[in-house]
UniProtKB/Swiss-Prot annotation:
Localization per record: Cytoplasm
Any one GO CC term of the record: cytosol
Gene Ontology MF terms: RNA binding
Species: Streptococcus pneumoniae (strain 70585)
Protein name per its UniProtKB record: SsrA-binding protein
Pfam families found in the cross-reference section: SmpB
GO biological process: trans-translation
Length: 155
């Protein structure tokens, strides 16, 4: 988790189900005026989003930011590519880790911190179906144990 995280606007719960998150980092987002207004109104969808490193820059793709209702001519295309702001060393590290290793960059959540839109970006490795079933099984077992412990403690 990012330190001092502000108001969470959107989360990508599907990413934690489909991927094993290895590392996370906070990135700034380059947005236009109407886009930041839509983000503050929580009109953003991270479900199919991904990021990739191209020419020393990190770009966010397939993230839908709904057009601002009162934006008229200033509205941008809802699923356009958006640049992410990171330090050069972070970008080089991400490029190294994603190149040919089966790792990908997945947006985990968007939040407002000190007036700026921030994105929690996860370095992730895809899960197989049997891994997903295993994690669901483990979660249900933990839930059952907690339920039994609660019943024992209430007696």
């Amino acid at each position: 988790m990012a330190k001092g995280e502000g108001k969470v606007v959107a989360q990508n719960k599907k990413a934690r189900h489909d991927y094993t998150i290895v590392d996370t980092l906070e990135a700034g987002m380059v947005l236009t005026g109407t886009e930041i207004k839509s983000v503050r109104a929580a009109r953003i969808n991270l479900k199919d989003g991904f990021a990739q490193v191209k020419n020393g820059e990190v770009w966010l793709s397939n993230v839908h930011i709904a057009p601002y209702e009162e934006g008229n001519i200033w509205n941008q295309e809802p699923e356009r590519r958006r640049k992410l702001l990171l330090y050069k060393k972070q970008i080089q590290k991400l490029e190294q880790e994603t190149k040919g290793t089966g790792m990908t960059l997945v947006p985990l959540k968007v939040y407002i911190k000190d007036g700026y839109a921030k994105l929690l970006l996860g370095l992730a490795k895809g899960k197989h179906d049997y891994d997903k079933r295993e994690s669901i099984k483990r979660r249900e077992q933990n839930r059952d144990i907690a339920r039994v412990m609660k019943a024992v403690n209430q007696r």
